Structures are given as C-alpha cells and as structure tokens.
Amino acid sequence: MKKILLTSLMGFLAWGTQAQEDLSQYVDPMIGTAKMGHTYPGATVPFGSVQLSPDTDTIPYEVNGRYNPEVYRYCAGYQYDDATIVGFSHTHFSGTGHSDLGDFLMMPTSGPLQLNPGTEADPDSGYRSRFSHDREHAAPAYYQVTLDDYDIDVELTATTRVGVHRYTFAQGEDAHVILDLMAGIYNYDDKNVWTFMREENDTLVTGFRETTGWARTRKVFFALSFDKPIKQYGNRKYDEKQAYRGFWGRFNESENFPEIAGRKIRAYFDFDLEDGEQLIAKMAISPVSTAGAIKNMQAETPGWDFDAIHQAGVDSWNKELHKVQVKTIQESDKVNFYTAMYHAFLGPTVYGDVDGRYRGLDMNIHQAEGFTNYTSFSLWDTYRALHPLFNVLQPARNRDMVKSMLAHYDQSVHPMLPIWSHYANENWCMIGYHSASVIADAVVKETVTADLAHALDAAVTTAQTAYFDGIGAYMEKGYVPEDVSGASVSKTLEYAYDDWAIAQMADKIGNASISREFAARAENYKNVYDQQTGFMRPKLKDGSWKQGFDPLDTHGQGFIEGNAWNYSLYVPHAPQEMINMMGGDHRFVEHLDSLFSMDLPDRYFANTEDISREGIIGNYVHGNEPSHHVVYLYNWTDQAWKSHDKIRMILRAMYQTGADGLGGNDDFGQMSAWYLFSALGFYPVAPGSVEYALGSPLVEEATLNLENGKTFTVEAQNQSEKNQYVSKVLLNGEELHEPFIRHADIMKGGKLTFIMKGRPNKKIFSKD
C-alpha cells in the first residue's frame, strides 16, 4: 500500500510539472456499488477489455428450478454491503440490469487448501475471505483490499487487455492461487459449455472458457503468467457426468498434469514464498486464441513493474478526464462529476487483440481494418445520452463504435444492426433498433462522414425486419398490438423515434425517398394515444384499446421500465406535436408538474425488478431511462423556467457521493451521461437532431477540451446552491432567445454563459 501511495504522489507531481491537475483523485469507483447502481469498484482503463474487480458472491441464477431474484443484485459481481470476497474476476459489466461475464476468477489463499468457495453465511466452509471496507481502497486503474482470513494484501491494476495482480502474503508458507473456471456472474446450471487449461511451463498457464446464457456462444481465451515459478499445481473437476474418459484414465490428471479439460474445473497453483513476500500475476484475455492472449500480454505488459503499469493506467484516465475541467459549487460536486465521467468512459469496451483480430458475430475471426472493434452495446440505454456525449468528447471512439456496429450488421445472418450485443453475440435484450439512432446522430453531427450509404442501408434493413419483436405488425398497422407482442406501447413509441432518426440520416445523405418513408413512420406514436384518457395505452390487433388500463402501473400495461404517466411523454422527435396532441401548453405543463409532485405508491412497481424507490421523484422515474429527456420538455412550452429547479433537484437526489449514491442502474454510463450533460447545462433530447435543449447548469465553470483542438466553455455567473434558476443565456456574448444550442456551436469552440438567480425569470425564452 505504501508503494501505491508513493507512486500516486509521484504521478501527481509528474502531472503537476505539466500544469495538469490529477483529476483521477476526484473519482470514487465505490459510487454505485450498493443497492441498484450495479457498478464495480475494480481496476480498469478507459474502454478497457479487462475489468479486474472483486466478486463478493457468485450465487446461482436458479434455486430449485426457479429464478433466484437475489442474483439481480450481483450484475456487477460486487455488493458493497457484503462481508466476504470470493475472488477477483477479469470481466464485468458496469451498471447493467442483466448480466454475464465474471471470467477467470482468481483468489490467493494460504494455509490448508480449499477449492469450494463456501458461503457468506459460513465463510470458513470455502476459500472466500472476510474483508473490511476500512482496509479496502478503489481508484482509477487500482483496487486494493486485505483478505482478513489469510492476511493477504491484494492489489489490482490493468491495461486494456491485461489484468495485473500483486499479492503480499504475510505468511508465505502454504501460499496458493486458485483459478476458478466455474465461477461467473449470473450462474446458470449449465452455463459452462467447456473449459480448457494447460501449463505451458512453470510460470505460464493458458486456456479458454466457453459459456452459454445471455450470450449464447461466448468464448474467451487467457494467458496467465506469474513472476515466480509454480511449485506444484492441480485441479478438481466437478462435472456431474463425463461424456468420454477413454485412455485418459492412465493419468492422474488432478495433480501436476499439464492439461485439463471439462465443464467445471477449479485449479490451484502453489508457491514457495517467504513471509511478507510478494507474488505478481498477469492475466491477459483474448477473443481469438491463447496465442492472441500471449501477444496482448507481451505488447501491453512486457515487464513486471506493477507500479509503472498502475501509473500508466492513472495517466490514461487523467488524459480522458482532462477533456472537461470544471469548477464546482462544492467539492462533492467535483467528485460526482469526475466519477460520472469515469463511469461514462468504461464502455463500450475494446473487443479485439493488439493486432486488430477479433471474433465476429459469425464466430469467425476478422481483422479490424482501420478501426478498433468494440463490444457491449447496451443500446436501449446508451443511445439517449452516452453516445451523444461521445460525439462531443469522444468522436474518434464513437466513429469506431459505429464501424463496429456496421461490422456486426455485415456478419449478421438476419441481417440486423446490434440490439444489445456483447462478446460476438446478439442477446436481443430490450426493445427498439437504437443502433439506428446512434448511427444517425453520428452522421448528422458529422462524426461519421464515410460509408454513409452502407450505414443507411443497415439501418433501413434492420427497421424492416418483420419477424423481429412486432415490427411486421408495426409496419402493417402503424402500431405494435399488445396481443401480438408485449410492451407494445413502448415498442411503438421507440420504433417511431428510431424511424425519425433514420429519416434524419437519409435527409443528411440526400436520399429523399427513404427520408419521406421513415418520416411518415415516425408519426406512428399518434396511433397509441388515447384522447379520452390522455395517455398512450396498449391497443389490440383488432384496433380496440386493451381493457384494465392503469396509467400508474409499471407492470402488464404495455410499457417497459415505466408507466403511462412517464412513457406518454416519449415523443422526443416531435415534442411540439405531442404537446398539441395532449391538449396544448397549459394541459401539458399540468401533466409535467403533476409527474414530479404526485405520489407513486410501491405497489405500482412491486412486480418490476428494474424499478426501485431510490430512483423515483414523485411519479418521475429517473432511475430508468425512458424518462431521461422529460424534464427538458418544458422548453417546448411557454414555461421553460420550470425545468431549472427540477434539474437541480434530480442532480441532487439521484447522484450523491457514497456507495449508494446512484438512484438506479448506471446502465453502462447512461445515468452518468445524463448527469454530465445536465451539470453542463444542456441535453440531447432527440439524438439525431443537431440541437441540445438548455437547462440549468450545476457547474460554476467548465472547459471542454475538444478533439479538434477547440475549447468550449460553460460559465454560470452567480452560481450557488440557492441560485438554481437561469435568468439569461448568452452564446459568445449574444443573448439567446430560444432554449437551444446547436452541435456546431460547441464543436467550433466558444462560450456559453448562464446568468443564475435565486428566483425564476418567468419570461425567459417566452414565446410572446
């Protein structure tokens, strides 16, 4: 630990000599690790393939043949309130509401060898260990904890494709490292299809794991290297049955045999160590082969200097964090801001070897020509604000992400763009075809300027795939019938928005016929609006409304992760038409006001796993993405000022320091991206548009250091906790008379000034 503190100090001084503040000091990876945040605290670098993090439990997905709801708490492998650690695995999702991964769990132990993980109720029954938050520390590219049962200090760091462990054994006798190839996140009974491992020499182990589940066919290869020779090794197989044993019976495969294969394997490696001696291990992963994993290790971690690897990781984070420099009202705001940037830059993740090879959707090996391939596209979440944020702060990476989506499309047998894809698999989670939105947003904002016909063709083909999720009925009837496909209202509304995004892309490219076709489809939201009730509601295939409608209920009403009160406001591409449809300004503002002030009793979301009380203000469900644009809809009314105090309220209520600081799943950075945009004072209500809706900033000042070399500054004059209302906005010294700025205003550099007051200016942006 002393070495890390010294290294961090040296790194800070190095940054200081470059007149750069060490912004990584404001990041707290523990934020979101309790309750519903589903973030992990471990070591990773920006967009890294490896997320080396502790798992506090690896509970089964089913108990007695039925879904175990407790498994939902472990989407990221770690729960802050747990008292034991099972081990440290190398792949994790950040903030998701469903899960996978948890590959290649390693656990250092000492004393009598145990190969079962045991239980939290009885830690002594297995190899897990008790731990205390008093002896745990998380920071960008670094995690440290003391395993109390073994008195082993564990330090973790990472490069893009390699996880690096440093273990300090207080007692070197009987030192073991367990490699659990059975462990994982969302442990289905038959999740492991096959595992294979071989000892190449006394310091190098290679192998792979193939799993099924959320990703139906997922294969990950590894190379594990130690800085000290293995004294002896062994394994235990837990396969219930063996398809073929044959002539393997002539060997004792369980001890010092150099290769082992099976569905359920745990291995161990013993070392001769002195008391207080350190052991370093490097685990490289590859989607291609063990040879690829070895190349990744050789390229990214050729030596054994843990501190240097750690410092390089900190430097990589500082480089990304310096894309925005902020002054804030209070120190905790700076912690929340840079932690949000950290979470936003965790994914999508690099998916390919250092030589550019990767496993494609067709399970073949492909070469990424001229781009870095990415995976883990949680698109139902991230199209809203994360990818638009990338168009501002990470355009080069977002360009590669679009190329990765198009590669997915080219390899798809359907063919379709990704819906929710990870590790060369389409898992079909959630709804919509929001790749179209991400691509359209990148095209209209000119992040992507090449291969445009290909991009448009991919989006159109995806949107015309009749057998996917009610699209056939949607194209035929202009809505998705509830008795054809569930969550039908949400699907209709989101398809209509995606269609609008396709129309914008077609218009940008100059394809008038496609633009007209999809602009017409974009009006399908009107077909699920019930004038009598004033809500969007589910309709049946015969054209009648589904009976038993309750606009407060989040379950069984045709919506996903929301209710009619929230989802009726989901027409981000046509807010003015939606307002007119709902009865005009006065009635619409009443609806918005009521949404934030009314009560949503627990019974209305008791059957919806992804919604919790922590993410709700009144009836506004911020912990779930469909409502993220809602507070900005005041901008299309004559009372734009009403968004100002509510934005500040959401920023304060849903984003706090501490492990339980997030009001819902971070959803691969979408919740964090909302915070970043809103703290800066503007938000992309409709990705695919070049406009951002103005709000009320939380920062005192922010400088955006853009990739094109320009800087864009946000200034909030008279900013304070009390002064949350905007009385005037100026762009480059000129007063704005509409509550919008354009993407080009940001990218060409300039200054956006908000004049803050303690009372609202009710005439701001007035239409009169």
Language model segments and positions:
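Bacterial Sec-dependent N-terminal signal peptides
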Residues: 1-21
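Accessory carbohydrate-recognition regions in carbohydrate-active enzymes
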Residues: 20-387, 391-437, 441-493, 501, ...
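ATP-dependent phospho-/nucleotidyl transfer catalytic cores
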Residues: 498
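Beta-strand-rich recognition domains
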Residues: 713-718
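Extracellular attachment/recognition segments
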Residues: 725
